[in-house]
Amino acid sequence: IVNTLNNTNYIFISHEHPDHFSIKFFKEYKDIIKRNNIIILFQETEDKRVENFLKSLELNLKLLKHKEEFRFDPNNSITLIKQGHIDSAFLYETKNNYHLNINDCNFIDNELKEIKSLIKDKSKKLILYIQFSYASFRPTEEWLKKAATYKLNNIKKLSNTFNCSLIVPYASFFYFSHEENQDLKKWSNNCNTLKKYLENNNLRFCLL
């Protein structure tokens, strides 16, 4: 982690859930983060909980508004896309490509149109980063099946919506540790299920 931080300029936090935001991490590595003048990018929120915590550690924080573009240099920029009260995605533009990271967001059609309007240069290819399985509680087996199917179909939907040149599925290797929760894993999508679905739908992808 220290080696990574010594070669890091920015840290993006999508939202405050513990699989995306670690209080322990920032407390433990705050001195290294400050020494390297790492800028933390986060969304403006009404409760300001994350904002106030990071400021209490005297870290360099840049708050972004919904659809606000933050430019790193002439060829690289990031645009934050809020969803609901807590979550966010981002659109990262480079010289040749757009990188759309959906994170944990579930955008409705109107929101997808709004994101699409942010893509100004139609000559650039778009790479999509997206979940491929559910990662939260579902009360019935039937609901688990539907949640798993929804995640796969959503990949196809977003790929078609944005005419993606490449899909990078990620962020779905969850594990419920308590014995009472073992059935929740029964219908989760694994890499083999995902690979078969993407190939059957002629979607170009990269599994890391």
Model feature map: region roles:
Residues 16-21, 47-50, 68-71, 86-87, ...:
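Active-site environment of divalent metal-dependent phosphoester hydrolases
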Residues 1-6, 63-130:
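Core dinuclear metal-dependent hydrolase active-site scaffold
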